Design a protein with these regions (language model features):
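A charged, aromatic-enriched C-terminal amphipathic alpha-helix characteristic of glycosyltransferases
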Residues: 321-353
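Nucleotide-sugar donor-binding catalytic core of glycosyltransferases
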Residues: 1-52, 59, 67-77, 81-82, ...
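Charged, glycine-enriched surface loops/patches
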Residues: 100-114, 139
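N-terminal Rossmann-like NAD(P) cofactor-binding module of classical short-chain dehydrogenase/reductase
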Residues: 88
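Conserved acidic donor-binding segment of nucleotide-sugar-dependent glycosyltransferases
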Residues: 303-309, 319-323
Length: 367
């Protein structure tokens, strides 16, 4: 089966993970990426370089201008040449409804699917960010929703088909690993949180963890965390917070006895990618509670949850003084995430199975 995966393609977690999984399943896969369209060109002067960079940043941020037109034209041309059975567009902020209509006219047998890890219908996002995607929703053959609550919302704005597609972990990157002595110095701790900052209750929760004297580490985008680590007397010791990627991300999880999982209130999350990555790493996950995440792991047996700051601190103290229980719950969570097929290859297999069943024998989509 021929599949074209389109997206920004900056991260190995998203488009690249999908691409690799589909290849593992034996399909012929091509990529279409648009982040490189916004790379600054070489200029003779520093001023020329800065003007070019500013111009491209503006077009990329506000999704206007000749570069956006070129991206859409090039996607149409690649689809015309490759003639995929499936066009899978990841976070299609840059792709317009007109483009999808053009693709459908020249390649009517191609199924066009869209997917987002962010919540494009949440009120906290700037309206301009998702305007092209939302306008194009009726032009997709199927929208894959990251969250349960988005399913009906997508239908209300014209989606033809909507199906839940949860996030995933990548077995090659998210797995138990024994840390070297040097890595233990860098990553060893009682409790870790790896993720971005949001102006929600996580600040109070993290401050309380530090206040109670637990050995805590935090990793994430510095531009997110700087706004709080420079203001909070308790969190100043962590400034500057640094991100971790690839093998270091996995080591940051494996180096902790407990890994925290907070949900994005901006995206109205009831689970997140780390819901699967933390158990896959073999570390105990202590997650913010939701009814949704409680359907995936048995509380106190395969992971644990907190609903209040007091419950969070109490459970941290319990697991740090009961090693055997902590190891047992972490191991059970690791088995659960594997048994329930939360890995990216299984996700893509489930996706293709859904498409095959939905479009029947008239489709060239095969699982």
């Amino acid at each position: 089966m021929k599949i074209l995966v389109a997206g920004d393609w900056r991260s190995e977690l998203h488009e690249a993970a999908i691409f690799g999984a589909l290849q593992q399943l034996g399909h012929q896969v091509e990529k279409f990426s648009w982040h490189q369209y916004f790379a600054p060109s070489k200029r003779e002067s520093q001023l020329g370089f800065r003007l070019d960079l500013t111009n491209k940043k503006f077009q990329n941020k506000y999704l206007v201008g000749p570069i956006l037109s070129r991206i859409n034209d090039d996607l149409v041309e690649q689809t015309k040449r490759f003639r995929p059975d499936l066009l899978f567009i990841y976070r299609g902020t840059h792709i317009t409804s007109v483009t999808l209509q053009r693709i459908k006219r020249q390649c009517p047998e191609c199924i066009i699917a869209g997917y987002n890890n962010d919540d494009p219908l949440a009120t906290g996002h700037p309206r301009w960010l998702w305007r092209h995607f939302i306008d194009a929703v009726p032009c997709y053959d199927v929208i894959f929703a990251y969250r349960q609550h988005n399913i009906e919302e997508f239908r209300q704005i014209g989606a033809k088909r909507v199906q839940l597609l949860r996030s995933w972990y990548r077995p090659a990157s998210n797995h138990p690993v024994e840390l070297s002595p040097d890595d233990r110095v860098r990553f060893g701790c009682d409790v870790v949180f790896v993720g971005h900052f949001e102006a929600d209750e996580r600040t109070d929760y993290i401050e309380e963890i530090v206040r109670q004297g637990f050995k805590f580490r935090i990793f994430g985008p510095d531009h997110d965390w700087d706004r709080i680590t420079t203001r909070s007397p308790i969190l100043q010791r962590f400034h500057p917070v640094k991100p971790v990627w690839g093998a270091d991300y996995n080591k940051a999880l494996c180096g902790a006895k407990i890994a925290l999982c907070f949900f994005s209130s901006l995206n109205r999350d009831t689970y997140t990618r780390r819901t699967f990555e933390i158990p896959a790493s073999g570390t105990l996950m202590l997650s913010q509670y939701s009814d949704d995440v409680a359907t995936m792991f048995k509380e106190g047996e395969e992971a644990d949850f907190f609903r209040t700051k007091e419950e969070l601190v109490r459970k941290i103290a319990f697991y740090l003084t009961n090693d055997s229980v902590r190891h047992r719950v972490a191991a059970a969570g690791h088995r659960r995430v594997i048994a329930d097929n939360h890995d990216v290859v299984s996700r893509m297999q489930q996706t293709l199975q859904y498409l095959s069943e939905s479009y029947g024998s008239g489709s060239r989509v095969v699982a």
